[in-house]
Amino acid sequence: MDSTTLQQLEEILEQKIPPIGPKGHNIGVWYPRKEREVFKDLCYSATKLLLPLYPIYIPSKGRFKSRLTSRVLERLGVPYYMVVEPQEYEDYARVIDPAKILKLPFSNLGQGSIPARNWIFRHSLEKGHAKHWILDDNIRYLLRRNNGVKVRCETVNVFRAAEDYAARYENVAMAGFNYQQFAINYEIVPPVRLNTRVYSCILVDNLLAAQVLDNGQLWRGKYNEDTDLSLRCLKAGLCTLLFNAFLIMKGATMKMKGGNTEEVYENGAKRKDFAESLAQQHPDVTKVVQRFSRWHHQVDYRPFAGNALIPCPSIVPSTPNNYAMFLDELTPQRYKEMLCRDGCK
């Protein structure tokens, strides 16, 4: 668009159009102009509880004191399994109902969460589940993004909404919630992004994911396991869904005790290994770059843009469904609970 046309468009819209960024991104504008609303004193609640259709697993290590994701799910009243190594079972059982804890048959393998993730996959298959959720253990709270604004979400109904959306299509191998920092308020962000990486809060289709097993294992390697699995599914012609309508706020992996920090991210030198491992697994779409004095992997997802969703017949509803969610008052007590940090009571 030339400068004259841009100026004419800005006059019609009665607002400035932000310049396009270095990656071709544009934050966009709202027309009519959207006034910035403040929702800091509100949260999403629900008039009724809609539990997830599929089990939620949380592989965890060394975080029985913080147990952030567990706290969130407890507060929202949703069942889950905390998956732990045997030497830490008693620590977790002192703070979590033992009926919610699954004890792994191994410990300290030095492979991060990979063995636990593969055990979880097999467990869900043995229990006859078509899909399962697998969540990182450092999720602080959930959010819903609607009309360009993120609001904290105090209902588990977003899991059911995501499940139902994924069920509209026959070939969605992975779906999940994006990180809240990647869906900025008032920027033009699609509610769902197709065919990209999904991590930290994932709904896995067991049957479809089984198409990409490597030596009988779903998860592999030591680093970047979520991105690796996303790429393997995409290379198999399957699709992934990343929700911007539903988001998670996480604690920083490197700043929290426990988890895979000691086994996988134990020092800065590991950063290059972390980046190079994905480039070795997927050299056709990955390169290693240095940003902000740290090594990163950079993945090109454009080759998978042609992976088309296959709709299931007669499954898309004809009317909107808010899954019983509504904007509610965010009380000081609720706010305190949502921001509960490591070791809080």
Cite the ranges covered by each PLM segment:
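Short, polar loop motifs at secondary-structure junctions
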Residues: 62-63, 84-90, 207-208
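Short, aromatic/basic amphipathic alpha-helical patches
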Residues: 69-75, 91-98, 190, 274, ...
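C-terminal catalytic/acceptor-binding lobe
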Residues: 1-55, 63-65, 220-345
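Conserved catalytic core of nucleotide-sugar-dependent glycosyltransferases
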Residues: 141-231, 235
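Short, acidic, metal-binding catalytic loop of nucleotide-sugar glycosyltransferases
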Residues: 45-51, 63-80, 95
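Active-site-proximal specificity loops/subdomain of glycosyltransferases
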Residues: 84-135, 140-154
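Short, hydrophobic beta-strand segments that form beta-sheet elements in well-ordered domains
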Residues: 56-60, 79-86
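A structural signal for short, well-ordered beta-strand segments and their strand-loop junctions
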Residues: 82, 131-135, 173-178, 240-244, ...
